[in-house]
Amino acid sequence: LHVRGFTQDVSSGVKNKGTFAGIREKIPYLKELGINAVEMMPIFEFDEMGSYRNYEGRQLYDYWGYNTVCFFAPNTSYESDHEHHHEGRELKQLVRELHEHGIEVILDVVFNHTAEGNEMGPYFSFKGIDNNIYYMLTPDGKYYNFSGCGNVLNCNQPIVQQFILDCLRYWVTEYRIDGF
């Protein structure tokens, strides 16, 4: 389930289109279908402008969310309430209400690459912390690109393994996510 895509069209009939709140409005519909679990496509904060371009006069942004900027934060553009310090509140409420209706929540989590891209990409986090530890690099310092997205996290490193475990644990304990 794509948070924005599920309710962004007027035909969804929701007030809060393209948001966590919009999905909450659709819980009766999900129950009517007999749904007992939803898998949300990436919901972490991502760089929507990372692949910004124009196509036939239309502005296109990164839609899917696979170029994560912060693995510990829900995407703020998926929230209808943009008041400061309310970040994450709508997602927590959505998960709680889905659980109340017997629907489990699974997240599509992609750790194999980030929004930092290759050596030409921006510095958001890992590059600035310890590029040689967090990313797999060729002997000449370029990024391995097994994913086709410009970089690959170096899961051979204990600190990267710990980061992944900490991240998954955070989503389970803080947001009550059921699986990945």
Q: Language model features by range: what are they?
A:
Residues 4-18, 28-179:
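Substrate-binding/active-site clefts of carbohydrate-active enzymes
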Residues 22:
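Active-site beta-loop-alpha junctions of metal-dependent nucleic acid enzymes
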